[in-house]
A protein has these predicted regions:
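N-terminal Rossmann-like NAD(P)+-binding domain of SDR-like oxidoreductases, especially those catalyzing
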Residues: 1-138
Length: 138
């Protein structure tokens, strides 16, 4: 399968990429490498993916519609795994527009890319912040 993986430089993204690559999938990873936390850590994760010939990285932002349109046009993806998100509740109160751009606009851009380019599978992980302060755990 050829998979577009957003948030590829994140902790979960890098591990998902490794699993997919080890099973033989082609992975195109995209990440904006923002400075919400140390970018050196993100770059180190990407270094771990470099040895895989079936991994390709794009430094880009899912909220940029034109970047995604170009990516979908050329990519011919079988699936999209969306792990890109601006996380952290406290920061969202200080910078709500960053959250809207990534978590809403970026998400919509991905859905539209899938719709217009016949991508049959879409996985969306969201973030732990959506669960709030629950006292009951499943």
């Amino acid at each position: 399968m050829k998979i577009l993986l957003t948030g590829a430089a994140g902790f979960i993204g890098m591990h998902v990429a490794q699993i997919l690559l080890k099973r033989g999938d082609e992975v195109v990873g995209i990440d904006n490498l923002n400075d919400y936390y140390d970018t050196a850590l993100k770059l180190a994760r990407l270094e771990q993916l470099k040895p895989y010939p079936n991994f390709h990285f794009i430094h880009g932002d899912i909220s940029d519609r034109m970047t995604l349109e170009d990516l979908f046009e050329k990519g011919h993806f079988d699936a999209v795994i969306n792990l890109a998100a601006q996380a952290g509740v406290r920061y969202s109160l200080k910078n709500p527009h960053a959250y809207v751009q990534s978590n809403i606009v970026g998400f919509a851009n991905l859905l539209e890319g899938c719709r217009h380019h016949g991508v049959k599978h879409f996985v969306y992980a969201s973030s732990s912040s959506v669960y709030g302060a629950n006292t009951k755990i499943p």
